[in-house]
Each structure stands twice: as C-alpha cells, then as structure tokens.
C-alpha cells in the first residue's frame, strides 16, 4: 500500500492492509508480504516507484502496489509508468478527479468520482468497499466514519475524535512511515486521546490568529470570498497544516453567515487552497475550472494542482506566488458573480 498523509489516506490504507493480511492468513500465505508506506503528497513520484521496486527486489518478491487517496493525477504519471516498466501490478483507490493517462497505467482502479465529483464518497469509503470484497470480516466501518468526518464529507454523521487524532499523527509522522505504525496506534486509546487534545489546542490557536489575517469580499448579494494568509498560523512544526487551517476559516465564516455562498482562498508562499460551502456548490461553483484556467494561463507558475469541486489546491513556484494569487482571486470572483 501507498497511502496519503491524512486521516482519509491512512484509513483507506488501513482498510486494504487489514483485508489483505486477513486474506493471506486464510490462504496460509506470508502475512509479512503485505505492507505499506505513507506518501507525503498527492503525487506518486518516480522516487516512490524506485523505492517500492527496490524493496520488492531486495525481498525477492513480485510487486503489486495499491495506491490510496492519491496517484490518479497527471503529476503521478511518471511514477506510475516506472512501476509498469518494472512489471509491477498497479491499483489505485481514490475519489479525486482522475487523469486518463494515469488510469491507462492501472491494472485496476476503484473510484467514486463518476457519480460524485464532490469527493463526499471518500477514499476511505471506497477502500472499505474494496476491502469487503477481499475479506469481508476485516473491513472496518468505523474507519470509514473517521475518513468521512476528516474530509468534511456530506455523508458524515456523528462525532469521531479519532479523525482529528489521525490527522494530527499523520501531520507529524515521518514522510514514509509504515502502515504497521498506524495499525498499532488506532488500537491505542490513550494515544488517540492525547493526539485529539493536541489537535484541538492547535486548531483553537490557529483560528484565533487567522481571524486577524483574513479579509472578506462581498460578491453580489449572496456570496462572500474569504482570503486568508495561512503562513501567519501554520508551519511544518505546528498543527494544523494549511489545508486543515483553511477548513477552520471556512467553518468560522459559514457559521457567521449561514445563508451566504462562501468560498475561502487560503495562501502561503508556495501553495493556494480553495474551500466552497454547500450553498456555493448548489449555485454552481466548482473549483476545478478555476484551477484548469490557472494551469492554462500560467503553466510556468503552477507546479501541480487539482482536487474536488469544493476543495482544491495548487502548488506554485514561489517567485510567481503573488501573481497566481491575484489571478485566482479574480477567477473565483468571476465564477461567483455568474451564479
């Protein structure tokens, strides 16, 4: 398994890990042949492929790689091609908009995107359905609830502090931490409670700072654009990370203006993220055309980008950060004004 570095990525990896281990045990196959490692981005890179192929070669094993909550994008094509060139079987389980070239390199692909482009059906949920078909008794419905809450899915119900705990642990883990490490931690109630408490404290502190560094722009009578400087409250050594911090900003303003269509744009030196609430989506706002236009107009400035209709991100070249931010703000205002 190769899984993304947040709760949805971890839970989707855990679903496949647990089911594959249970299957191996039943078939009297070596369970230690099932393992997994975190990927600290949405891109499966050539370096990731090299590490996986070498790891399998050194163990004298044929390799199959299951990638969860990442890898179905154009930026991952080189890494996926490296896997295929080595004779590796490739499966991707994801809920992000897929790239045709990436899919062409997969032996199997499981996604919710054709019937849900909002991303509400998380990778954790899709992986759960795959896990049930591998070994039904090992699939864990509780992990699905964690992933739905963490990704702010409209399918989420209930309150699961474990979701915050896994997001916190993933943020501070080593870049390629093993899936076994998470498998142990999700059974450690004390560890999860501690991580949850630390996550909440970090979020409270970050929101307090960001409220002082966010501006609001009225668009028409029913829409607001919130622009927040995420660098004021986030860093590699603090929690929450930028995406989670922007969620806090979005939630805060949605609570203040419950009848408004609200889009939040959070930026730092090298990235910009978008969040849109249900009213904005219902009015027709979609982040993907905004990002597609940026890629077309400023290809030299955009390193990578994509996401869902209501939550997306672009990585930018630092020297072009300001110009990308200004253009994105214009595109969002234009999109909201049309609705």
Predicted regions mapped to residue ranges:
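N-terminal small/polar loop signature for handling phosphorylated ligands or for N-terminal nucleophile
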Residues: 5-11, 22-91, 97-103
């Amino acid at each position: 398994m190769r899984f993304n570095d947040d709760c949805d990525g971890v839970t989707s990896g855990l679903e496949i890990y647990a089911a594959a281990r249970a299957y191996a045990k039943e078939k009297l196959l070596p369970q230690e042949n099932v393992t997994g490692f975190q990927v600290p981005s949405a891109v499966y890179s050539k370096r990731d492929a090299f590490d996986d192929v070498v790891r399998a070669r050194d163990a004298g094993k044929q390799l199959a790689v299951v990638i969860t909550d990442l890898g179905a994008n154009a930026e991952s094509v080189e890494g996926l091609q490296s896997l295929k060139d080595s004779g590796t079987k490739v499966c991707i389980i994801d809920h992000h908009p897929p790239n045709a070239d990436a899919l062409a390199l997969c032996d199997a692909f499981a996604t919710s995107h054709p019937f849900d482009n909002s991303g509400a059906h998380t990778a954790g949920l899709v992986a759960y359905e795959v896990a049930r078909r591998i070994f039904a008794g090992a699939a864990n419905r509780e992990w699905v609830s964690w992933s739905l809450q963490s990704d702010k899915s409209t399918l989420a119900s209930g309150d699961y502090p474990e979701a915050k705990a896994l997001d916190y642990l993933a943020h501070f883990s080593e870049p390629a931490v093993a899936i076994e490490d998470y498998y142990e931690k999700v059974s450690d109630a004390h560890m999860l409670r501690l991580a949850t408490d630390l996550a909440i404290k970090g979020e409270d502190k970050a929101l307090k700072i960001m409220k002082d560094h966010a501006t609001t722009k009225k668009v028409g009578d029913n829409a607001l654009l919130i622009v927040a400087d995420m660098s004021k409250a986030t860093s590699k050594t603090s929690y929450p990370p930028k995406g989670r911090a922007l969620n806090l900003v979005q939630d805060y303003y949605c609570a203040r203006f419950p009848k408004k269509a609200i889009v939040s744009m959070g930026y730092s030196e090298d990235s910009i993220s978008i969040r849109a609430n249900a009213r904005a989506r219902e009015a027709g706002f979609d982040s993907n055309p905004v990002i597609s236009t940026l890629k077309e107009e400023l290809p030299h400035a955009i390193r990578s980008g994509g996401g869902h209709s209501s939550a997306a991100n672009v990585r930018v070249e630092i020297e072009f950060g300001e110009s990308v931010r200004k253009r994105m703000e214009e595109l969002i205002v234009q999109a909201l004004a049309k609705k």
